């Protein structure tokens, strides 16, 4: 006689339980997906391709036919593309078979460029100038350390960039032998599964302005005490919004 009474709570629980919503899983999958375009072919270079004007990659995948050496420091000779001052690279996919990705020797524009697997760095901004570097659209994933390494001076503008599974999206060089004041402006970023979005040297007057969304990113903006001694690692000063790190906390989830 007690069985109906025991079953009643179970029936009520089932009746009022939240039904399975298949769109929930789809939303999570969508959030975690990497929207890299389909490749239109592949090109392997035996040496870096130098660009002095505008190069449209036609959404082909470009590489060097070599195995990534991890965080072992490479150089310009290991890059896929080397951009001269004022050059533009657009509509290209950088494959996993490379070490240094893209080098800019001065101001440059990187538009709709995607890195399937970052090796040492995805994009290295070199030179001694104080111009503007623009990264528009595109994305990168699987960077053990940095995606964008800013060694030169000037401003970096990053718009509508997608980054996943990374150490840092942007890092102003912490121990270059010649230091500069550097500025980074990030808008429309979509970041997930990272250690830090931005690292700057506030003692040199660096500033970062950030907007967009971030999911599972431990720190958004980290300030360091930069040094010109390249045998010394820069010390971390602080993390979070400040006069140097300009953003509203928390950033929205992606």
Curated annotation (Swiss-Prot):
One of its GO terms (molecular function) is pectate lyase activity. It holds the Pfam family Pectate_lyase. It catalyses: Eliminative cleavage of (1->4)-alpha-D-galacturonan to give oligosaccharides with 4-deoxy-alpha-D-galact-4-enuronosyl groups at their non-reducing ends. Residues 228-254 are annotated as: Disordered. Keywords: Calcium, Carbohydrate metabolism, Cell wall biogenesis/degradation, Glycoprotein, Lyase, Polysaccharide degradation, Secreted, Signal. Gene3D superfamilies: Single-stranded right-handed beta-helix, Pectin lyase-like. Its EC number is 4.2.2.2. The keyword Secreted applies. One of its GO terms (biological process) is pectin catabolic process. SUPFAM superfamilies: Pectin lyase-like. Its cofactor is Ca(2+). The keyword Signal applies. It is found in: Secreted. Glycans are attached at residue 175. Binds 1 Ca(2+) ion per subunit. Pectinolytic enzyme consist of four classes of enzymes: pectin lyase, polygalacturonase, pectin methylesterase and rhamnogalacturonase. Among pectinolytic enzymes, pectin lyase is the most important in depolymerization of pectin, since it cleaves internal glycosidic bonds of highly methylated pectins. Favors pectate, the anion, over pectin, the methyl ester. This is Probable pectate lyase E.
